[in-house]
A protein has these predicted regions:
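A conserved amphipathic terminal alpha-helix motif
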Residues: 132-177, 182-185
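Glycine-rich portal/gate segments that line the openings of hydrophobic small-molecule binding cavities
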Residues: 38-96
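Short, surface-exposed coil-to-beta transition loops
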Residues: 2-4, 65-71, 102-108
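Hydrophobic/basic alpha-helical segments enriched in Actinobacteria
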Residues: 21-22, 35-36, 99, 122-125, ...
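Solvent-exposed residues in well-ordered beta-strands and their adjoining turns
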Residues: 8-12, 58-60, 112, 131-135
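Intrinsically disordered, low-complexity terminal tails and inter-domain linkers enriched
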Residues: 82, 113-124, 169-187
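Beta-strand/loop substructures that line and gate deep hydrophobic ligand-binding cavities in soluble
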Residues: 77-149
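Hydrophobic ligand-binding cavity/cleft-lining segments
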Residues: 1-49, 188
Length: 188
């Protein structure tokens, strides 16, 4: 069974793409219903890399419901019309506890520029599409309803957090800083 989301995010596609690759944003969109912690003695990287990441999943901040493998890779559609689309795919699944009932998940998150173009203020927004395919045998209908409800929460949180993902330009160079009145190399 599938869970689908499709909406616009109030941030540019590059900011949305960075957020999808951030363990911090991953946790923020799930809170307070679920929280994720690294499984083992490691800490989350600043940015997800490809490969597998194991996590412990806590519900309502109170109890661990299981462990999950997050297996990430990035995809690009082959068609010219979708050239600007970037896709992050998680092909992991539950590995322990209640989550072991969901051993195979296929989760794809697609980021593309808003097809309508920039808004009246010249800001480009992001078309976000999310697809989760759930296979849990006889438990699939129950898993689908639970995940559908949680996905609605994720969608709400994504839309709410997106404006905070704005791109921060690189720090000014020392030369630019020295151009400020009253600044010298000694005070820089």
């Amino acid at each position: 069974m599938r869970v689908l989301l499709k909406f616009l995010l109030d941030c540019d596609p590059d900011a949305a793409w960075r957020a999808l690759q951030s363990p911090t944003a991953f946790r923020e969109v799930a809170l307070p219903w679920l929280d994720f912690q690294p499984d083992g003695d490691t800490s989350f990287p600043t940015v997800w890399g490809g490969g597998e990441h194991r996590v412990r999943v806590r519900a309502l901040g109170a109890f661990t419901v299981g462990t999950q493998a997050i297996r990430l890779d990035t995809l690009r559609p082959a068609g010219e019309a979708e050239h600007a689309t970037r896709i992050l795919r998680d092909s992991g699944g539950g590995t322990g506890g209640v989550l072991s009932a969901l051993p195979h998940l296929d989760h794809r998150m697609a980021i593309a520029p808003d097809p309508a173009g920039p808004d009246a203020d010249g800001r480009l927004r992001t078309l976000y599409r999310d697809q989760l395919i759930v296979r849990a045998g006889a438990l699939t209908p129950l898993a689908w309803y639970t995940l559908w409800a949680f996905w609605q929460w994720r969608g709400h949180r994504l839309r709410r957090l997106a404006p905070t993902w704005a791109y921060d330009p690189p720090a000014a160079s020392v030369t630019e800083e020295l151009d400020e009145p009253g600044r010298t190399e000694e005070t820089a």
